[in-house]
Swiss-Prot record:
Keywords: Chaperone, Cytoplasm, Protein transport, Translocation, Transport. This is Protein-export protein SecB. The keyword Cytoplasm applies. The gene is secB. It comes from Haemophilus influenzae (strain PittGG). Homotetramer, a dimer of dimers. One homotetramer interacts with 1 SecA dimer.
């Protein structure tokens, strides 16, 4: 009997990360200079921006939104070829994680699961605009998380240093 209680307690302590739903929250594709842009030499300059948003939507339920914005201009003329914006989202059940683990899960693991969907959507939108194929390179969300944590630690150390200087 006590083994069953221990098994139940151990099960309750296990970290949980489950996908509940993956969906497109928002999408936009603009090609303001069509059709004359196709008469120019195709030397694209790609601008890429990536961010995430997280919202707790219930007990152990989190919505994570991966925002991708791609703006392509032509090098010679500076004309905008296209602007593609995608908000790929998912609802995840997450429990049994400490603060840093939870932050890593929400800002690295969940976006990593969403990225292939967003990359495919961007590729399809660009293709439907009849532009040359655009395949976004994989993103190392773990490295971005480490970079974020290092920035946070540096900012915290800087704040402590400033507080100590004002005390003296």
């Amino acid at each position: 009997m006590s083994e069953q209680k221990q098994d139940v307690a151990a099960t309750e302590q296990q970290p949980v990360l489950q996908i509940q739903r993956i969906y497109v929250k928002d999408v936009s594709f603009e090609a303001p200079n069509l059709p004359h842009i196709f008469q120019q030499e195709w030397k694209p300059k790609l601008g890429f921006d990536l961010s995430t948003e997280t919202t707790q939507v219930g007990d152990d339920l989190y919505e994570v939104v991966l925002n991708i914005s791609v703006e392509t201009t032509l090098e010679d003329s500076g004309d905008v070829a296209f602007i593609c914006e995608v908000k790929q989202a998912g609802v995840f059940t997450i429990s049994g994680l400490e603060d840093v683990q939870m932050a890593h899960c929400l800002t690295s693991q969940c976006p990593n699961m969403l990225f292939p969907y967003a990359r495919e959507l961007v590729s399809n939108l660009v293709n439907r605009g009849t532009f040359p194929a655009l395949n976004l390179s994989p993103v190392n969300f773990d490295a971005l998380f480490v970079e974020y944590m290092n920035r946070q630690q540096a900012e915290n150390a800087e704040e402590k240093s400033e507080e100590e200087q004002t005390k003296h």
